[in-house]
Amino acid sequence: MNRYKDAGVDVEAGYDLVKRIKKDIAATSRPETSGTIGSFGGMFDLEKLGYQHPVLVSGTDGVGTKLMIAQEMGINDTIGIDCVAMCVNDVLAQGAEPLFFLDYIATGHNDPAKLAQVVHGVAEGCRQSGSALIGGETAEMPDMYPKNEYDLAGFSTGIANKEDILTQDLAKEGDILIGLPSSGVHSNGFSLIRQVLFKDHHLKVTDRPEALEGKSIGEILLTPTKIYVQAVLSLVKRHLLHGIAHITGGGLIENLPRTYNDDLQAEVNLGAWPVQAIFRYLQNKGQLKEQDCLNTFNMGIGLVLLVPKANVLQVKEQLKQKNEQYYEIGKLRKRPIGEKKIVFNGSFK
């Protein structure tokens, strides 16, 4: 008799999970990593990177109630990409190169096959961002979570030379705002999405509204959050940018002003980029005002680069070389007394 297992915690299932994820973890290895899976801590040799005045930059995040969509659909192998993306894009926004990542999974019942799929997604996100997955924790808590549910969070650490950190002081009047498209909703606003679609309108994740061009609601919503590291890190290292805004919870309204001082104002042209069908669909179904959408969703722009005028052509050319789409969406100007830090012109396409 195993009293611990009877109480709801299966240690053997934990060992099974570790075996299943070893190959995925190994695929994220970097030359700076050391130690083995199962050690008490993950290790990373900073000296090999050759930074002169290194500053570590850390970020942590989860996936929010997007997890509920994944679990309802039984699609667990992409939600880990979202978790990594939410963390590494934040680290990138400070001007840092993501180095390593740790994940935390909490569940009511350790299903090794299911959770291995989750970690597979985490590993894929790490590969896309150049991060080593150096550790993690799986907590089986039968009285805390329902049997078939899990929660996921992650922790990213990056590095930059102190003088290369992107701060608000770098942004200047006349800087051009270049927006990089999102892959969709990303990982924010899902409580509102679920309220509008599933509670107010009683829709199902398997429904295929005509407005979504034949794709199911669940399929669209589960599109992984885009990771921007490969496209943007080289621009940071070449000192071509004055700032980066990761457009997450709070949308453009809350996140873009975080990149510049109070004496500046962002002027954003709403017609400068196409808005994906899912945002129009949500706006119509929820009868949401444009301002509410801008304050909740990314509305098609996942990352905004603050670019000095003199660097705009070079930045655009390098983005083209990376096959990264971009839109010139506005500029920074002096903030008139009494006005907000961000204003919008026109309307969405």
Curated annotation (Swiss-Prot):
Keywords tagged on the record: ATP-binding, Cytoplasm, Ligase, Nucleotide-binding, Purine biosynthesis
Group of enzyme by EC: ligase
GO biological process: 'de novo' IMP biosynthetic process; adenine biosynthetic process
Any one Gene Ontology cellular component term annotated for this protein: cytosol
CDD domains: PurM
Superkingdom of origin: Bacteria
Protein family per UniProt: Belongs to the AIR synthase family.
The name this protein goes by in its record: Phosphoribosylformylglycinamidine cyclo-ligase
Gene name of the record: purM
